[in-house]
Swiss-Prot record:
Residue numbers binding lanosterol: Y105
Cofactor: heme
Reaction(s) catalysed (UniProt annotation): a 14alpha-methyl steroid + 3 reduced [NADPH--hemoprotein reductase] + 3 O2 = a Delta(14) steroid + formate + 3 oxidized [NADPH--hemoprotein reductase] + 4 H2O + 4 H(+); a 14alpha-methyl steroid + reduced [NADPH--hemoprotein reductase] + O2 = a 14alpha-hydroxymethyl steroid + oxidized [NADPH--hemoprotein reductase] + H2O + H(+); a 14alpha-hydroxymethyl steroid + reduced [NADPH--hemoprotein reductase] + O2 = a 14alpha-formyl steroid + oxidized [NADPH--hemoprotein reductase] + 2 H2O + H(+); a 14alpha-formyl steroid + reduced [NADPH--hemoprotein reductase] + O2 = a Delta(14) steroid + formate + oxidized [NADPH--hemoprotein reductase] + H2O + 2 H(+)
Expression induction or repression: Expression is induced by azole antifungals such as prochloraz, tebuconazole or epoxiconazole. Expression is positively regulated by the FgSR transcription factor that targets gene promoters containing 2 conserved CGAA repeat sequences.
Keywords for the protein's UniProt record, in alphabetical order: Endoplasmic reticulum, Heme, Iron, Lipid biosynthesis, Lipid metabolism, Membrane, Metal-binding, Monooxygenase, Oxidoreductase, Steroid biosynthesis, Steroid metabolism, Sterol biosynthesis, Sterol metabolism, Transmembrane, Transmembrane helix
Predominant location category: endoplasmic reticulum
Extra facts: In Fusarium, the biosynthesis pathway of the sterol precursors leading to the prevalent sterol ergosterol differs from yeast. The ringsystem of lanosterol in S.cerevisiae is firstly demethylised in three enzymatic steps leading to the intermediate zymosterol and secondly a methyl group is added to zymosterol by the sterol 24-C-methyltransferase to form fecosterol. In Fusarium, lanosterol is firstly transmethylated by the sterol 24-C-methyltransferase leading to the intermediate eburicol and secondly demethylated in three steps to form fecosterol.
Protein name in UniProt: Sterol 14-alpha demethylase CYP51A
EC numbers on record: 1.14.14.154
Subcellular location: Endoplasmic reticulum membrane
InterPro entries noted in UniProt: CYP450_sterol_14alpha_dmase, Cyt_P450, Cyt_P450_CS, Cyt_P450_E_grp-IV, Cyt_P450_sf
Source organism (scientific name): Gibberella zeae (strain ATCC MYA-4620 / CBS 123657 / FGSC 9075 / NRRL 31084 / PH-1)
CDD domains in the cross-refs: CYP51-like
Protein function: Together with cyp51B and cyp51C, encodes the sterol 14alpha-demethylase that plays a critical role in the third module of ergosterol biosynthesis pathway, being ergosterol the major sterol component in fungal membranes that participates in a variety of functions. CYP51A encodes the sterol 14-alpha-demethylase induced on ergosterol depletion and is responsible for the intrinsic variation in azole sensitivity. The third module or late pathway involves the ergosterol synthesis itself through consecutive reactions that mainly occur in the endoplasmic reticulum (ER) membrane.
Length: 507
């Protein structure tokens, strides 16, 4: 019997010794140029639980104790958080030779997006790829997207069983995930791709999305069930796009004039003279679909949930359309120019992106020692630096009652000024560095999201269309929205999240 107990006992003793050694190590004097280390009980795992359950709360507590710059341990990695507007600027505008995103995000994204695109290619090539896909984000393209998006929303609410009858309930995150994949595919990718968005294709998208689980930051190639589904889905989805491309190469299908992304990419050439290979076109299309859907799905869900919690805002949005857009008492189909006539709608989108950013942490791998401005700290190459624009967006320093969702806070707030001299071209067009603003819902620097204008158009049209057709309320009639689910790479409302809808009378 003693022999059966001795081995577990030794394991416990060894574990206890490791914990004690870790605690003693944290008490040792640190070099003055090293950022303070956040306390943690267990080596390797470090602060993973506290950070994973509530990253924003974790940042807030650490900031109170250590200031804007501190180190925490995340599964063996030393993460140096650089918070505040200065921290955002330091991380997001870091020079490519000092810090890069590829080493952090490559292992996670390559199995999902595919090879030779985004983080599986030199940064200069990524900048060219971003320039190629801006074809679908021009002013002319955005104007053409509006009625396509509106039609997709109307088709969904007219045909989906969840919207049958005069009133019922609906699981908001589920519905908005479906609506946004339809709007993103139809507007950014074209009618041909949209037609292929059958239930089978949607299932492939879901399986591919499983690849964005946080565990895949560390173990992207583990033969876990969700990774096997991810890999199979990527192959099948790539085949869908390759079939379209091959048919077009043979001249069998006519492209849509001016709005078809596949046709655009088929005609693009890199600076070295090489046409974009068909495989890379397919991988860019997968990337574009997922990038266009993820943030819109989360943001639109939060908007609808807040509108259900605040029916007065919903009615203000409806009246705003009646006052500014109605013709002879009726609301005509939306046009791009209509969005500028709906300031409250824009403020609802803006406020939701402030309170509910889908990405709370932005990481870069340090390649050369970096001196943190206005501090004694030097960050060495064994570390990863991290910015969190969410921290400034939710700070009382910049926004009164920052944790309260209040679209009217933007009514009299001067538009964030952009220094026209602080502009840089990373290879895909001139953009503002923008990192001195406390409000950065689309990031900043060379990896700033190029789909900002599309996101505002997509969200604005979706919300305007829903408000035209429905009154919204919470199930029990009391205000409130769900907690945030941080278990995925992209923050989103905890599911399920049901609300009640009531169809408006036609005017």
């Amino acid at each position: 019997m003693f022999h059966l107990l001795i081995y577990p006992l030794w394991v416990l003793v060894a574990l206890f010794a490791v914990i004690i050694a870790n605690l003693l190590y944290q008490q040792l004097p640190r070099r003055p140029d090293e950022p303070p280390l956040v306390f943690h009980w267990f080596p390797f795992f470090g602060n993973a639980v506290a950070y994973g359950l509530d990253p924003c709360g974790f940042f807030e507590k650490c900031r109170e104790k250590h200031g804007d710059v501190f180190t925490f341990i995340l599964f063996g990695r030393k993460i140096v958080a650089c918070l505040g507007v200065d921290g955002n600027d330091f991380v997001l505008n870091s020079r490519l030779q000092d810090a890069n995103a590829e080493e952090v995000y490559g292992p996670l994204t390559i199995p999902v997006f595919g090879s030779d695109v985004v983080y599986d290619c030199p940064n200069s090539k990524l900048m060219e790829q971003k320039k190629f896909v801006k074809f679908g984000l021009t002013q002319k393209a955005l104007e053409s997207h509006v009625q396509l998006i509106e039609r997709e929303v109307l088709d969904y609410v007219e045909t989906d069983p969840s919207f049958s009858g005069r009133t019922s309930t609906i699981d908001v995150p589920k519905a908005m995930a479906e609506i946004t994949i339809f709007t993103a595919s139809r507007s950014l990718q074209g009618e041909e791709v949209r037609r292929k968005l059958t239930a089978e294709f949607a299932a492939l998208y879901h399986d591919l999305d499983l690849g964005f689980r946080p565990v895949n930051f560390l173990f992207p190639w583990l033969p876990l069930p969700h990774n096997r589904k991810r890999d199979a889905a990527h192959i099948k989805m790539r085949e869908v796009y390759m079939d379209i491309i091959n048919d077009r190469r043979k001249g069998g299908i006519r492209t849509e004039d001016g709005t078809d992304m596949i046709a655009n990419l088929m005609g693009c050439t890199y600076k070295n003279g090489q046409p974009v290979p068909d495989k890379e076109i397919a991988h860019m299309m997968i990337t574009l679909l997922m990038a266009g859907q993820h943030s819109s799905s989360s943001a639109s869900s939060w908007i609808v949930l807040h509108l259900a919690s605040s029916p007065d805002i919903t009615e203000e949005l409806y009246q705003e359309q009646l006052v500014n857009l109605s013709v002879n008492g009726a609301l005509p189909p939306l046009q791009y120019s209509d969005l500028d006539k709906l300031p409250l709608l824009q403020n609802v989108v803006k406020e939701t992106l402030r309170v509910h950013s889908s990405i709370h942490s932005i990481l870069r791998k340090v390649k050369r020692p970096m001196q943190v401005p206005n501090s004694p700290y030097t960050i060495t190459t064994d570390k990863v630096i991290m910015a969190s624009p969410t921290v400034t967006a939710m700070s009382e320093e910049y926004f009164e009652n920052a944790k309260t969702w209040n679209p009217h806070r933007w009514d009299n707030r001067a538009k964030e000024e952009v220094d026209t001299e602080d502009v840089i071209d990373y290879g895909y067009g001139a953009v503002s560095k923008g990192t001195k603003s406390p409000y950065l819902p689309f990031g900043a620097g060379r990896h700033r999201c190029i789909g900002e204008k599309f996101a505002y158009v997509n969200l604005g049209v979706i919300v305007a269309t829903l408000v035209r057709n429905f009154r919204l309320s919470t199930i029990d009639g009391r205000p409130g929205v769900p907690e945030t689910d941080y278990t995925s790479l992209f923050s989103r409302p905890a599911q399920p999240a049901f609300i009640r809808w009531e169809r408006r009378k036609k005017i």
